[in-house]
């Protein structure tokens, strides 16, 4: 059965309210929020917005719905400006799960590391393979920020070292660190769902005994590590810089991403006095800041 899709443009201030209105008043069977500028959402700090500044609200309707009536209802809600931009499309019914699965393939990062969907055969059984189900967690390796961190980890000698994954999300970086030789990894995240995802993915990869996960309030006192990786956002990286630097042993190595190239210098300023920084690495408008703690 075909479906009708209506896409509206909104701001982060009214997108969720518009989504509620579409579900409750116009008969939408589902509503999805997409970034109009193709930027991913990262876990925000408490009080920060969860949506983008320029958000597309996409509503799905059964094919026999009257789109002109739906658009009148949207207009009558006064939640969008007069003459609001919209797009109406017919969407063919598909095996969405199969199509979704077909979009994910094993990906190589650095020399040794592969991230593989669990339903696919690993390309190189002798490589370091992390099995992950895209969609069951927050990070899958497809975004440049995750790729930058994975490539950095692959380039380190992690043998016997302790690693902290600050903002662990799916646990992809934590699991990769263990598979690359780390003795122990501690994952920290403000979202309990992220901790569950990390545990599930660690178990899927057989490394659950080497990974511990904590909410910030529960992390061990005096926690320090040889290596810290933080793939979050520029704002938290600046605001939490004393905490992040405090997690590093003297001589320890730090990598940070989730940073747009235009934000790199403003983040680096918070770390330059305490770390010997490497050249900034860039990928598709995103960047990685890394360095070694002085002392």
From Swiss-Prot:
Key word Cytoplasm present: yes
Catalyzed reactions per annotation: L-lysyl-[protein] + 3 S-adenosyl-L-methionine = N(6),N(6),N(6)-trimethyl-L-lysyl-[protein] + 3 S-adenosyl-L-homocysteine + 3 H(+)
Location in or out of the cell: Cytoplasm
Listed SUPFAM superfamilies: S-adenosyl-L-methionine-dependent methyltransferases
CDD domains, per database record: AdoMet_MTases (cd02440)
Predominant subcellular localization, coarse grouping: cytoplasm
Pfam families (UniProt xref): PrmA
Methyltransferase among keywords: yes
Enzyme class: transferase
Residue sites binding S-adenosyl-L-methionine per the record: 146, 167, 189, 231
Record-level GO cellular component terms: cytosol
UniProt superkingdom: Bacteria
Gene Ontology molecular function: protein-lysine N-methyltransferase activity
Keyword vocabulary terms for this entry: Cytoplasm, Methyltransferase, S-adenosyl-L-methionine, Transferase
InterPro entries assigned to the protein according to its UniProt record, in alphabetical order: Ribosomal_L11_MeTrfase_PrmA (IPR050078), Ribosomal_PrmA_MeTrfase (IPR004498), SAM-dependent_MTases_sf (IPR029063)
The protein's Enzyme Commission number: 2.1.1.-
Gene Ontology biological process terms, A to Z: methylation
Protein family membership: Belongs to the methyltransferase superfamily. PrmA family.
HAMAP family listed in its UniProt record: Methyltr_PrmA
Cited PANTHER family: ELECTRON TRANSFER FLAVOPROTEIN BETA SUBUNIT LYSINE METHYLTRANSFERASE
Its job: Methylates ribosomal protein L11.
Name under which the protein is recorded: Ribosomal protein L11 methyltransferase
Provenance organism: Vibrio cholerae serotype O1 (strain ATCC 39315 / El Tor Inaba N16961)
Protein's gene: prmA
């Amino acid at each position: 059965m075909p479906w009708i899709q209506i896409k509206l443009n909104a701001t982060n201030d009214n997108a969720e309210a518009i989504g509620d209105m579409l579900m409750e008043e116009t008969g939408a069977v589902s509503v999805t929020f997409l970034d109009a500028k193709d930027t991913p959402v990262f876990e925000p700090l408490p009080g920060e917005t969860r949506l983008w500044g320029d958000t597309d609200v996409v509503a799905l309707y059964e094919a026999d719905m009257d789109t002109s009536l739906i658009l009148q209802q949207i207009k009558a809600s006064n939640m969008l400006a007069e003459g609001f931009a919209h797009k109406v499309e017919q969407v063919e019914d598909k095996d969405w799960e199969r199509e979704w699965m077909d979009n994910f393939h094993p990906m190589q990062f650095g020399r040794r590391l592969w991230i593989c969907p669990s339903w696919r055969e690993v390309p190189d059984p002798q490589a370091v393979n992390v099995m992950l189900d895209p969609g069951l967690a927050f990070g899958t390796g497809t975004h440049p920020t995750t790729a930058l961190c994975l490539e950095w980890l692959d380039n380190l000698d992690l043998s016997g070292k302790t690693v902290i994954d600050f903002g662990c999300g799916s646990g992809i970086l934590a699991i990769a660190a263990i598979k690359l030789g780390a003795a122990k990894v501690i994952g920290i995240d403000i979202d309990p769902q992220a901790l569950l995802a990390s545990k599930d993915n660690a178990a899927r990869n057989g490394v659950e005994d080497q990974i511990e996960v904590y909410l910030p309030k529960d992390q061990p006192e005096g926690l320090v590590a040889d290596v810290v990786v933080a793939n979050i956002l520029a704002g938290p990286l600046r605001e939490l810089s004393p905490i992040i630097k405090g997690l590093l042993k003297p001589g320890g190595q730090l990598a940070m991403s989730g940073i747009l190239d235009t934000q790199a210098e403003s983040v680096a300023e918070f770390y330059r006095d305490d770390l010997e920084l490497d050249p900034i690495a860039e990928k598709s408008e995103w960047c990685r800041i890394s360095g070694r703690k002085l002392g």
